[in-house]
Amino acid sequence: MRIALLAGDGIGPEITAEAVKILKAVVGQEIEFDEALIGGAAWKVTGSPLPEETLKLCKNSDAILFGSVGDPECDHLERALRPEQAILGLRKELDLFANLRPARLFPELQAESPLKENIVTGTDLMIVRELTGDVYFGTPRGQRKDDQNRREGFDTMRYNEDEVKRIARIGFETARSRSGNLCSIDKSNVLETSQLWRTVVLEIAQEYPDVELSHMYVDNAAMQLVRAPDQFDVIVTGNLFGDILSDLASACVGSIGLLPSASLNSEGKGLYEPIHGSAPDIAGLGKANPLATILSGAMMLRYSLKREADADRIEKAVSTALEKGARTADLGGKMTTSEMGNAVLAALN
């Protein structure tokens, strides 16, 4: 198993180092990591946030473990050269159209949630977000002057039926592997794009008679996520709505330092990363929480490498470490990044 290791910027090298430590402890010599530059670190050396060498490595690897991108020293660059463009480029080049973001409340961390205990207890959901279409990629887009010489910005929200079909199937398959309940979230009372979305999802539902499908408007879904998050198991939605709702769900369960993600293509190749950013303000200080990256490694084992038992083992070790009181600063503790990794390592054994 060959893994492309893209540590990136900010806290990326620190948190990926802990994930690699755990993965090697679980899998041993069967897994090998090939490092490459990406983001601001790559731009400083090559002049590109996504060098051809890095892209080639990713295409030839079994999976990608990604740290973070984002560097204030690159804020002056034009959009195409900014570190954040690297992740967009990888999604496009590898056709990583399906983003899976679990949001699970660890019982040991109920006090970290901003929601009341009786509301948030039992929250364990998965958001399946379409990642390569919608308003983020639709054209035309830009800025111009209107007929009265006023500045205006414009974007295009667009989906075709094939894009909706393939993400819907991922949603149904994910629901089938869990509780059998899927909620499709759209804005079909207003948007033509969402009307197509709902129509196609209903068509695909005929292929999954064992999965119970419901629909919800995105504004109501946002309210329901903070009112009664335990009503959801699997959510499938578009790029824009998924971007917003997944961040909201992450806040419901506590620190974003706990939440992993997977971005998959139709062949099962995936990019695995924590949902948080590069946090340049604490880079190199040993304050970052590595658990989201460690859990991203577990998702990599499950979805791309088909090692379910190993993934379960890592997730159980994280839970055990938290149960024994392991806490980094974001969780109200004093552990360093490496100490948290060592706590998970000890729990493995």
Swiss-Prot record:
EC number: 1.1.1.85
Coiled-coil segments on the chain, per record: none
Keywords from the UniProt entry: Amino-acid biosynthesis, Branched-chain amino acid biosynthesis, Cytoplasm, Leucine biosynthesis, Magnesium, Manganese, Metal-binding, NAD, Oxidoreductase
Disulfide pattern: none
GO BP of this protein: L-leucine biosynthetic process
Source species of the chain: Zymomonas mobilis subsp. mobilis (strain ATCC 31821 / ZM4 / CP4)
UniProt entry tagged with the keyword NAD: yes
InterPro entries: IsoCit/isopropylmalate_DH_CS, IsoPropMal-DH-like_dom, Isopropylmalate_DH
Quaternary structure and partners: Homodimer.
Subcellular location: Cytoplasm
Residues annotated as binding NAD(+): 277-289
Family classification: Belongs to the isocitrate and isopropylmalate dehydrogenases family. LeuB type 1 subfamily.
Catalytic reactions on record: (2R,3S)-3-isopropylmalate + NAD(+) = 4-methyl-2-oxopentanoate + CO2 + NADH
Pathway(s) served: Amino-acid biosynthesis; L-leucine biosynthesis; L-leucine from 3-methyl-2-oxobutanoate: step 3/4
Keyword Cytoplasm: yes
Stated name of the protein: 3-isopropylmalate dehydrogenase
Positions contributing to Mg(2+) binding: 219, 243, 247
Cofactor note: Binds 1 Mg(2+) or Mn(2+) ion per subunit.
MF-aspect GO terms: 3-isopropylmalate dehydrogenase activity; magnesium ion binding; NAD binding
Function: Catalyzes the oxidation of 3-carboxy-2-hydroxy-4-methylpentanoate (3-isopropylmalate) to 3-carboxy-4-methyl-2-oxopentanoate. The product decarboxylates to 4-methyl-2 oxopentanoate.
HAMAP family registered for this protein in UniProt: LeuB_type1 (MF_01033)
